[in-house]
């Protein structure tokens, strides 16, 4: 049982927590709903409800590059401090919230060395994860830096993954599931000791509906018109 679920069970009058979710940041400040400003709103809401949120920063341009407006990019690393501060402040406000936030960056991003060597003291409430593929073997300096940081406990390492259609899917906080941006991993519990075998399918379906709709209020509007998910909408 995750800590945030256990915390809710101890005080079920609070909103049930989302367990884990993913956000892929687009390379813009505010011209796209999934830009940096959108990621701050998304992370804030997730952390307020005790969620774990993985923020993938690899689409951001490298530090020092210019955009079409002549603005100089900050790169992905400086924004990690904002996400760390979000987690720190939201944990302290009111009732303690057992949220978590992880910043992800691909190993082939030009700023990866800054990412893995970033001063931990500046991002105490944030974890880091490096997304790698077999090509990392061809960059021994990067590989050594990543492995050294992993040995010190400064970063985690996860493989890049793609779905059956060749589309990128992204690791969540615990690295137990791969999701697309804004997708969510939900946790609930079914007591198999009191369920007849014939009732198991219904138990899981009812459990998911109860979890997604009745408790979290995070039911996605996109699901209302889809034909591929559990809801059969």
Which ranges hold each PLM region?
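Extended catalytic cores of very large enzyme megasubunits
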Residues: 1-233
